[in-house]
């Protein structure tokens, strides 16, 4: 946690500085629009000069922070976005600087009446005939020359920094392209692995379908055999019913015969008994 917090703070500082720089650029652009108008006073020119210096200093601070981006743990696409925003801000600042220099050289600032009167009085009391307007112009030219030298040095430094940022951006892009290539290759490998897995699954499914087809064929044969057995059993049942009917008829006939036989036997026994009784009865009487 202690190592992570400073990193987040630095990254937030870069974003905050860029945001503030864009805001100051907007204010700088508004001031430039007032150059050559009725609001173009010496105070405005002084504010404009301070704004230039502050923006140049802020640009250097942001440049130093961006140089430390590769060592941060920010994703590369975020680093690239920050570098891109910085380049756009630098280009916008250089464009506004060029516009400001052209407008300042084309227009003279308006001197307030009280300050102009005081400068005229000082000029009249001066023995060498110093002209207030000319002295101010000379002073303004000296300040402009000093600022131009400062701006040229800053532009040279900015150009060197822009080259470094271009190299940094190219390195980031190459790293991102490499990451994208690795990511694409990883996706392709995963897709190929999935395709191979699908092919294996399809092969296994085909084998399972073949096994099911064989089982269905075997079951079909078994069903045919079962159907034959059922048919045979049905025939056997019908035959058994016929046999049972025959057996029932035979049993009924046999029962009738047995009854007749028993009746005949009883009649015979009764007749024999009567005969014996008569026979023995007659013999005993004699």
Swiss-Prot record:
InterPro entries: SNARE, Syntaxin, Syntaxin_N, T_SNARE_dom. It is a single-pass membrane protein. Residues 97-160 are annotated as: Disordered. Residues 185-247 form the t-SNARE coiled-coil homology domain. The keyword Disulfide bond does not apply. Residues 1-257 are cytoplasmic. The keyword Electron transport does not apply. Residues 279-286 are vesicular. GO terms for cellular component: endomembrane system; endosome; Golgi membrane; SNARE complex. It comes from the Eukaryota. One of its GO terms (biological process) is intracellular protein transport. The chain crosses the membrane at residues 258-278. Residues 114-160 have a biased composition (Low complexity). It is found in: Membrane. Residues 97-107 have a biased composition (Basic and acidic residues). GO terms for molecular function: SNAP receptor activity; SNARE binding. Keywords: Coiled coil, Membrane, Transmembrane, Transmembrane helix. Disulfide bonds: none annotated. Belongs to the syntaxin family. This is Probable syntaxin-7B. It comes from Dictyostelium discoideum (Social amoeba). The lineage of its organism: Eukaryota, Amoebozoa, Evosea, Eumycetozoa, Dictyostelia.
